[in-house]
């Protein structure tokens, strides 16, 4: 397979970077805005700090699965980043003050271990599965950001 894909999108939300960080870093709220991740809960650690682990349950029409993720960056009002499965996928949120609120950027990057895992488990079907996940991120990120904006600006 080619170089692992990455996707990012941004939106401006009429809230402070700190408020938005607090919302996003409370992973137990992820199901409020994600079209795929329906629930998250803390496994280890006491919340959004580097090294803490949490699990999530994802649902799409074809299947339901759980993941385990570790926080790798947590700077209030600046960035919140976690890696799924040890080293499979990197999800990140950055918060930049702008006129009218905060620009929130959500990013998603497939890491090399995910490519290896897909090739080992799916063989010739790996590229199709990767394309499926890329499309889910491509459509899911804007939907997540729009829902986050709606929830944040309604609070």
Where are these regions (language model features)?
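Hydrophobic ligand-binding cavity/cleft-lining segments
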Residues: 1-49
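Solvent-exposed residues in well-ordered beta-strands and their adjoining turns
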Residues: 12-16, 59-61, 96-98, 107-111, ...
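Short amphipathic alpha-helical segments with heptad-repeat character
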Residues: 14-17, 21, 131, 135-138, ...
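Residue-level detector of alpha-helix boundaries and kinks
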Residues: 5, 15, 56, 126, ...
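Beta-strand/loop substructures that line and gate deep hydrophobic ligand-binding cavities in soluble
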Residues: 83-139, 148
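Glycine-rich portal/gate segments that line the openings of hydrophobic small-molecule binding cavities
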Residues: 41-90, 98-103, 139-155
């Amino acid at each position: 397979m080619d170089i692992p894909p990455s996707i990012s999108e941004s939106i401006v939300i009429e809230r402070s970077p700190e408020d938005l960080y607090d919302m996003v870093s409370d992973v137990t709220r992820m199901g409020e805005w994600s079209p795929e991740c329906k629930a998250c809960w803390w496994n280890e650690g006491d919340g959004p700090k580097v090294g803490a682990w949490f699990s999530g349950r994802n649902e799409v029409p074809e299947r339901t699965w759980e993941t385990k993720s570790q926080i790798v960056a947590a700077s209030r009002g600046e960035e919140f980043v976690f890696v799924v499965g040890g080293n499979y996928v990197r999800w990140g949120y950055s918060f930049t003050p702008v006129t009218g609120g905060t620009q929130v950027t959500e990013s998603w990057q497939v890491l090399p271990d995910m490519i290896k895992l897909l090739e080992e488990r799916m063989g010739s079907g790996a590229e199709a599965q990767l394309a499926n996940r890329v499309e889910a991120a491509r459509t899911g990120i804007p939907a997540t950001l729009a829902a986050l904006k709606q929830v944040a600006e309604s609070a």
